[in-house]
């Protein structure tokens, strides 16, 4: 099983080929190819490569499927024994990316 751990949008993801992942919004067009080059770890059929901090010889190719918004999160603030209440909602802007290939140079 071939997988990689990648840093993108300030977070780390366990990536496998043929699957799609939701990242924080990436400002690119739909259908465009992207390359992820901040690879922290690669497992290639049992052979493990660890970057210090990144692996320069590994690139991951992906395709942007869609831009979407995440599930709504409600933030409710209230002060006890007062009439102060504040309800606020937030939906995170996301980009869905299909991972096509993990390339090792």
Swiss-Prot record:
Its primary localisation, in coarse terms, equals plastid
Name the Gene Ontology molecular function terms of this record.
rRNA binding; structural constituent of ribosome
Q: Name one GO cellular component term.
A: mitochondrial large ribosomal subunit
The yes or no answer to whether the keyword Plastid is present is yes
- InterPro entries in the record: bL21-like, bL21-like_sf, Ribosomal_bL21, Ribosomal_bL21_CS
Record keywords: Chloroplast, Plastid, Ribonucleoprotein, Ribosomal protein, RNA-binding, rRNA-binding
Respond yes or no to whether keyword Cell inner membrane is given for this record: no
What PROSITE patterns is this protein classified in?
A: RIBOSOMAL_L21
Subunit-level organization: Part of the 50S ribosomal subunit.
Q: What does this protein do?
A: This protein binds to 23S rRNA.
What family does this belong to?
A: Belongs to the bacterial ribosomal protein bL21 family.
Q: Could you identify this protein by its name?
A: Large ribosomal subunit protein bL21c
Q: Which gene encodes it?
A: rpl21
């Amino acid at each position: 099983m071939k997988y990689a751990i990648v840093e993108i949008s300030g977070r780390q993801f366990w990536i496998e080929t043929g699957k799609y992942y939701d990242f924080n919004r990436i400002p690119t067009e739909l259908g465009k190819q992207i390359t992820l080059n901040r690879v922290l770890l690669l497992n290639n059929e049992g052979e493990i490569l660890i970057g210090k901090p990144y692996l320069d010889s590994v690139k991951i190719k992906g395709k942007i499927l869609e831009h979407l918004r995440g599930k709504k999160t409600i933030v409710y603030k209230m002060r006890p024994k007062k009439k102060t209440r504040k309800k606020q909602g937030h939906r995170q802007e996301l980009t869905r990316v299909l991972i096509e290939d993990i390339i090792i140079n």
